[in-house]
């Protein structure tokens, strides 16, 4: 019953793409994949960002039916959630009734309802219903077709060889210094390099190499010719190229990322597809043209027909009397509901149950504004891991916390001391506008550079010896005793050895006191970006963040700007645990820049002219929340005023208890730890330095909601580390500009993170990266399973599941909640068509809380339609 039997008309995309230029066809096909960043700057990616013009249901139907990619959890997961109380049965019934109201039904309401309710709760039609002889006879007479897309190589069983060839060439092309020999002709692009080398490839037969003799040297020409030689018709070109992109979406996604980085939207994909389809033609040429594929599959009709007879209240005679069109419509209806509809209703019921519990937790208490002046105000990233830490900080003293995107509104790329490369320290959807450099005086930098150069020399020498043909034979004898001791120590006493090695590395890499290029100092020669900021820009960036989070008055003597970082060992996915808003890097640099800007006298003067008066006694300091050990580390503490010094001492004294409480809460969720570790801080530190630890922390697993509003709304509420918290005060935002910026930036990043976790959970073999213990880092850019697989784009299974059978992450679409008047939400949806489309098509959910009445309003399709018709 899982096989598709729907006969579809030509898709709208196919009709548009027929007879279109090749670039248009490739652009349309590219919507099924997403860019993939290198793993050193792992950024959460929304795998279906190009498909948001379709509804979530239609995208799921299309991917499952045509390519076998399932976007919904299996029924066993829904039943497990039901047994744990995470799904309320009443919501399932409510969603079913609403669905029946909205859907065109091929049968009387009572018959369709009986069928759907039975399919909701049953995994299969009873065997006796399937074995009725007359039913089998009727099923065999139904001319229904499957619509799965099968490329020529798949039909001939050559897809594995084609994938192996593509993996080999992609690894060579993208290598970042790992390979001993660099790929020749790389300057000619992916296709150009392959075209020059493929005729010499010994893995191709003599006949196959001969076929490439007069093959085009230009990628567009090669792709066009390959489509013609393979017999791909214009109307099927988009679907055919989609199938090839989805065969290895990781490598194709890397091609998209590199191409966009170079300012060419689809040039890289044309190169990639030109190589792939050229190879496909080379392999399949002796068998072309293929006979037209037979799509009929009478066997799949039986369970659908049996479902109507067994649960729909029909007899076989009733079925025979139906016109052929009605029978077909009923089968299509049952098939789509079985494959997609029923699980979508279960998903919505799961989401509704979570929303109801969150609504109760938030609205049962009256929001209270702070009654006393805070001693310290702390600005945290919206990351869900900040929520427990913020809650515990606020509980131990006169401290206020705020949430914002962890790049603190600074569209910068950063260049740390002596680095050759600059890192975009802002979200992937934001283009850097400035570069900030870290510098040190020659006197203080000299000792640091000597230590650094010594470590680099040792590392390079070891690497060269390891790769040398003869010297490599001596390396085990030379290094064996030392590496053996290292292995024994890290395995027998992971906490002690890991901590000792970590301390040694920190001491060796300890940087001298550095300064930041905050003021304008010309332009970067490579990127052309201005180094530093003008005085007006400095004022505006600080103002923008303070207004966005509603911190424009009542400043505490101490304001702590907290970036965040994760510290782990032997973890290729380390950047996935760092700050996504900082481009997959630690947030300390941005925190330091913002704090320094906010302390500048001319910035304070500029803010005062804008109506934001920061007292002279208020000092901004930079810190970093280490999420693996729930510790706050100081990045830069300038000279403090007397009041700020007192607040600093008070906060430091409270942080030890905060760390213990936050770690105890977090450790209890990790498998094999127990409800309450004897020493949660020690356990957290062990996991951070243990090189065998596959799950040092849960990261952002469990994320489910994004709340935009005052902290008074949620202060003291236990949100279980599942909610992104962005501070916002609608009273400070009469034009709605700040809200629009939060939705366009942080909320969109939150949606990407949410759908990355969703995809890695529901389709781990496709959108995840499998078992972390069997992965291999390849070319310095990503990971594979073993030494020959797709470039894995998602999260490892250990990031979303406690075991092979137990999921930790609940795959729910992000619920965005905004505390603002009704008119603010209407204006937002009216002006932001992209956000409205996300909500209307089900890629995220939207609710709002009226600040005056406390009413919780759901913004679903019907309400959105009324907004559009205003």
From Swiss-Prot:
Molecular function via GO: zinc ion binding
Major localisation: membrane
Positions bound to Zn(2+): 381, 383, 564, 579
Single GO cellular component term: plasma membrane
Topology of this chain in the membrane: Peripheral membrane protein
InterPro entries (UniProt xref): DabA (IPR018752)
Pfam family, one: DabA
Cofactor requirements of the protein: Zn(2+)
Subcellular location(s) of the protein: Cell membrane
UniProt keywords, alphabetically: Cell membrane, Membrane, Metal-binding, Transport, Zinc
Family label: Belongs to the inorganic carbon transporter (TC 9.A.2) DabA family.
Known partners and oligomeric status: Forms a complex with DabB.
UniProt function note: Part of an energy-coupled inorganic carbon pump.
HAMAP family xrefs: DabA
Official protein name in the record: Probable inorganic carbon transporter subunit DabA
Source organism of this protein record: Geobacillus kaustophilus (strain HTA426)
